[in-house]
């Protein structure tokens, strides 16, 4: 039996053989894709009206998070499905986007003016998610994957399941969501206008040709100091595979720090290449193809770094991975 399973058998039958077992095995291996497609299609058609009602009845930030997660779930379930059902989903996503835009327009200024009453947002991540873990004396890797969507995370999650357990939650980005604003807000714990006022030497204006995210490490330091902590930290930004391979070899030395911040830009670079590079554009013509390409990139990273993941887990109880879009 072990040898058969090791050779990736499709199924097995045990004597005495029941005719229904034989029929089930044949259907499973010959018609499985058709059955799954039909079942998924019927499932979404039944859910369509409920999701529409949920969109209309979404009045809180938690409501909208649930809508988003449900739409992402069905997008992944239907990615290989017939065009008619996929068109229904795209129409529903557009409806949700329009309604969500109105929700943000109505509430955003209140969130800015009343930080204690708003949902978890970019400036709050370190204060509410990172610092409490450091307060317990645990070492922490904070990995920020730029321009990484929830549907892409769902596509690659199983690649990391061997090494991590997951505690997932969503947060709301500030506006604009552009890197120079939202990512600086995460690392500083401040709104962009506050960064400009409190640390003018670390803020780069929109019109400037200088890189807008060159001061992320100093911004992290200012946030730690503002909370009167003395935690040690490292900061690394991975732009290419060569730097990534070099970083992996330094994992043991990073264990001396209480906080290690790693920014991964490859998904963002892939996103830009999707519009600027003809070959990448052809490889990722659809959202499903784009997710598949993202998975391939993550798989390559996983193969290169499996040994170092084990080393990290031996020294750190928790690793937070922030998916930022």
Question: What does each of the following model-derived ranges do?
Answer:
Residues 1-11, 24:
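Alpha4 helix (beta4-alpha4-beta5 surface) of REC/receiver domains from two-component response regulators
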Residues 17-26:
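C-terminal output helix
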Residues 27-40:
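The C-terminal output helix
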Residues 46-51, 113-136, 150-239:
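Active-site nucleophile/metal-coordination loop of metallo-enzymes that catalyze phosphate/sulfate
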Residues 59-109:
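Low-complexity, highly charged intrinsically disordered N-terminal segments
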Residues 137-156, 186, 259-264, 293-319, ...:
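Beta-strand elements within well-structured catalytic alpha/beta cores of enzymes
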Residues 257, 261-292:
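Active-site His/acidic residue clusters
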């Amino acid at each position: 039996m072990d040898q058969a399973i090791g050779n990736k058998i499709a199924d097995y039958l045990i004597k005495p053989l029941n005719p229904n077992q034989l029929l089930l095995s044949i259907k499973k291996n010959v018609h499985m894709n058709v059955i799954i497609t039909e079942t998924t299609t019927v499932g979404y058609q039944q859910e369509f009206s409920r999701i529409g009602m949920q969109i209309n009845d979404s009045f809180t930030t938690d409501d909208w998070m649930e809508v988003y997660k449900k739409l992402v779930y069905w997008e992944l379930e239907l990615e290989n499905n017939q065009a008619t059902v996929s068109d229904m989903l795209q129409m529903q996503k557009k409806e949700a986007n329009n309604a969500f835009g109105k929700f943000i327009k109505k509430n955003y200024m209140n969130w800015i003016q009343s930080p204690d009453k708003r949902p978890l947002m970019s400036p709050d991540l370190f204060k509410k998610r990172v610092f409490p873990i450091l307060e317990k004396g645990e070492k922490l890797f904070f990995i920020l994957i730029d321009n990484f969507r929830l549907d892409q995370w769902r596509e690659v999650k199983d690649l990391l399941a061997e090494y991590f357990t997951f505690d997932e939650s969503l947060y709301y980005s500030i506006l604009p969501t552009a890197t120079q604003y939202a990512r600086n807000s995460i690392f500083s714990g401040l709104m962009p206008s506050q960064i400009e006022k409190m640390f003018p030497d670390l803020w780069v204006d929109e019109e400037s040709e200088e890189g807008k995210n060159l001061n992320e490490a100093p911004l992290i330091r200012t946030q730690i100091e503002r909370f009167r902590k003395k935690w040690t930290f490292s900061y690394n930004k991975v732009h290419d595979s060569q730097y990534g391979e070099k970083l992996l070899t330094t994992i043991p030395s990073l264990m001396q720090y209480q906080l290690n911040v790693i920014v991964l830009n490859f998904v963002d670079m892939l996103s830009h290449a999707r519009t600027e590079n003809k070959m990448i554009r052809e490889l990722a013509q659809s959202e499903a193809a784009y997710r598949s390409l993202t998975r391939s990139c993550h798989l390559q990273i996983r193969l290169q770094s499996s040994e170092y993941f084990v080393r990290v887990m031996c020294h750190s109880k928790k690793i937070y991975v922030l998916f930022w879009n």
